[in-house]
Regions:
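Short intrinsically disordered, low-complexity coil segments enriched in acidic
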Residues: 2-7, 429-432, 520
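Short, surface-exposed polybasic-aromatic patches that bind anionic ligands, especially phosphate groups
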Residues: 497
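Short alpha-helical interface patches
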Residues: 44, 50-77, 237-244, 313-316, ...
Length: 534
């Protein structure tokens, strides 16, 4: 049409006849208008075609974060905790809130999450260390490179590592002897008893559990107030509960005590009355209390490690300290209460120290510690005190079994970073699929007509599709992970073994269980300031 218009314009200029010139000019104008309309129609069709092929987002706009977006969001700042890599960029999180990692056993949590952060983070750190691998690989580095004091609680003497001690009852004497805080002693003892005899979700038999806790509270108050620090220990508590003669002698001592305004004597009177009027219930209380401290019997593995203290958990806040709790993997299920008792005390001690100096708790085998009394409630307060908890579990079902559904949901809501990989449980895969959200996709329908010679017709529609289906999550490659970070789009990131990062690969000592780690050419490099002795 535009060519015709040009020809008409040339003809109108070159033809001398006025009528012909007028006709050619009019024809050219008509051609221009027609051409413009045709071009506009073509553009309109193209616009509609693109609109038909572009999802509207009406069902959702979920998508994964890109590497550039991660950099703009501050997730590549090495001042934070290490998470993985995305499009060649190492990912870190500098927030103050907590983290949780969910992955099955032998899936690489240690090599791609725990060890990297023990080699990277210079904050004081408390580490649960099944097998002693974490201390074996990272303790020397944290002592020599970061200049930290290293404590290894290692009752079983694994791998020739140090065998430091911590007495969980010693601080009760400190409270009793300090008149300014003595009134808090009964609350401390009650919290200890609740940790030793936790309250499960199933509230049946609560009467007997409370009876056992009352017995523990009474004896611990007596231990704290009688002025014999060397015998204020869990093995001594076991001796009293286990031996009827010692129990009688202890009750006589308590009855004559004026400590705490007569509270200790009142406990003795109450216990004696229960023993006289309801001996069967009293025997149940004794059995429950004895069972709670049975792992601390004087002939057991833990006895020496809890008889005295070589350090204070408060040092985690006031200095630069790394504390490793080493336990054989086959003892986690039977002696996990030791981990739980010390972990609760460590968190409490650090939270009570002034200031907000950062302290990291790396809690592997978290569900096997037993229930940490009050943890789900205190998680909301700890970030403001500089305390960050990284919980590591094999499945969310483990958490629900120990803490119940409501408390588990609270723990998850307080985890600013949620890390998942090697997912095989369908329930977890479904939960993750829902959490990732939905996106809008275009669907194409083809109508072949009723007759063989009918032209096929096409129609487009929109539908909702999960960003990843449960099956796609379960079939993710081994080296990939899903990161859910509060206020950010989800990230499908790479897991990064510590030996692929310089200088981590040089800092890590050989694994005392599996030997030397691989030494490929590093994929990533970080730069650290030299340690200063000031």
């Amino acid at each position: 049409m535009f060519a015709l218009a040009a020809a008409c314009a040339w003809g109108a200029w070159s033809v001398p006849n006025d009528a012909a010139q007028w006709f050619l000019a009019a024809s050219g104008a008509v051609a221009v208008i027609a051409g413009t309309d045709r071009r506009r129609a073509e553009q309109d069709r193209e616009r509609k075609r693109r609109a038909a092929e572009t999802p509207s987002g009406v069902y959702g706009t979920a998508s994964f974060m890109t590497g550039e977006e991660a950099a703009r969001a501050g997730l590549t700042n090495p001042a934070g905790l290490f998470l993985g890599a995305l499009e060649g960029r190492m990912l870190f999180h500098t927030g103050k809130a907590h983290c949780i990692s969910v992955a099955p056993a032998r899936s690489g949590k240690g090599t791609s999450a725990v060890i990297p952060n023990l080699l990277h983070s210079q904050a004081s750190t408390y580490i649960i260390d099944p097998k002693g691998e974490l201390a074996g690989v990272t303790a020397r580095h944290r002592r020599e490179t970061f200049g930290q004091k290293v404590i290894v609680l290692n009752p079983w003497g694994l791998h020739g590592l140090p065998k430091h001690r911590f007495n969980p009852l010693a601080y009760l004497i400190d409270i009793y002897e300090d008149e300014t805080i003595r009134r808090g002693l009964t609350e401390e003892v009650a919290a200890l008893a609740l940790q030793l005899v936790p309250e499960p979700e199933d509230a049946r038999n609560k009467f007997f559990r409370e009876g056992s806790r009352k017995l523990l509270r009474a004896i611990m108050l007596h231990f704290a107030s009688r002025g014999r620090p060397a015998s204020c220990t869990l093995p001594d508590l076991w001796r009293v509960l286990q031996n009827a003669t010692r129990m009688d002698e202890t009750l006589i001592e308590m009855a004559g005590s004026d400590a705490l305004g007569g509270v200790v004597a009142d406990f003795a009177d109450d216990i004696a009355r229960t023993l006289e009027k309801n001996p069967e219930s009293f025997q149940s209380f004794i059995e429950g209390a004895t069972q709670a401290v049975s792992i601390f019997d004087p002939a057991g593995w833990l006895a020496d490690s809890v008889m005295a203290s070589d350090f204070s958990f408060g040092e985690l806040k006031t200095g630069k300290v790394s504390v490793y709790l080493v336990i054989p993997p086959d003892r986690v299920a039977t002696h996990g209460a030791w981990l739980g008792l010390l972990t609760r005390q460590a968190i409490t001690a650090v939270a009570r120290q002034p200031g907000n100096t950062p302290v990291l708790f790396m809690l592997d085998e978290f569900a096997n510690m037993g229930k940490l009394a009050g943890l789900s409630e205190s998680l909301t307060l700890l970030p403001g005190l500089g305390v960050r908890v990284w919980i590591i579990v094999q499945s969310l079902d483990q958490l629900r079994t120990v803490y119940g559904r409501e408390a588990t949901n609270t723990i998850l809501s307080q985890a600013e970073v949620q890390q998942f990989f090697a997912v095989q449980d369908h329930g977890l895969a479904k939960m993750l699929s829902d959490a990732l959200g939905q996106r809008t996709v275009k669907t194409l329908s083809v109508n072949l007509g009723r007759k063989e010679d009918d032209d096929p017709g096409e129609s487009r529609a929109e539908a909702a599709r999960p960003l990843m289906s449960p099956d796609e999550i379960r079939l993710m490659p081994t080296g990939q992970q899903i990161l859910l970070i509060q206020s950010h789009r989800p990230i499908r990131a790479q897991r990064v073994p510590f030996w692929t990062v310089a200088p981590w690969c040089d800092w890590a000592a050989p694994n005392p269980v599996e030997g030397a780690h691989p030494r490929p050419e590093p994929t990533y490099r970080l730069t650290y300031r030299e340690k200063r002795d000031d």
